[in-house]
């Protein structure tokens, strides 16, 4: 079995309502995302000797993750304060992305993993999500 990975970069704003530090304030990150795929090689056809064509992986991640999330305010739809901020931003024609969980690196990594594995049927082995150049979370099942 082979493992291949591709890295992506995107920017998002968020806050962690109720956090006991600076992250309770609205702030942003340049996230680095590493998507790792595992599998056997195609035996024939245009993709012969590949696990997945890197350009196909790039297109899927762009469509499912980057296009909706890049330069958005990601917020917890179950949190009143974050939802109010999102409503204001939407009225000002700013991009938002709502999720039903607290927007920690850990939960975002799990969300991305599940979106790619279950929604797109990719054989994801792990997701790494860097929130800063020195801090990342890895999620795998």
UniProtKB/Swiss-Prot annotation:
The active site is at residues 23, 71, 131. Keywords: Lyase, Metal-binding, Queuosine biosynthesis, Zinc. Binds 1 zinc ion per subunit. Pfam families: PTPS. GO terms for biological process: queuosine biosynthetic process. The keyword Metal-binding applies. The keyword Zinc applies. Its EC number is 4.1.2.50. Catalyzes the conversion of 7,8-dihydroneopterin triphosphate (H2NTP) to 6-carboxy-5,6,7,8-tetrahydropterin (CPH4) and acetaldehyde. It catalyses: 7,8-dihydroneopterin 3'-triphosphate + H2O = 6-carboxy-5,6,7,8-tetrahydropterin + triphosphate + acetaldehyde + 2 H(+). Pathway: Purine metabolism; 7-cyano-7-deazaguanine biosynthesis. The active site is at the interface between 2 subunits. The proton acceptor Cys is on one subunit, and the charge relay system is on the other subunit. Zn(2+) binds at residues 14, 27, 29. It comes from Haemophilus influenzae (strain ATCC 51907 / DSM 11121 / KW20 / Rd). Its cofactor is Zn(2+). This is 6-carboxy-5,6,7,8-tetrahydropterin synthase. Belongs to the PTPS family. QueD subfamily. The lineage of its organism: Bacteria, Pseudomonadati, Pseudomonadota, Gammaproteobacteria, Pasteurellales. It is an enzyme of class 4 (lyase). One of its GO terms (molecular function) is metal ion binding.
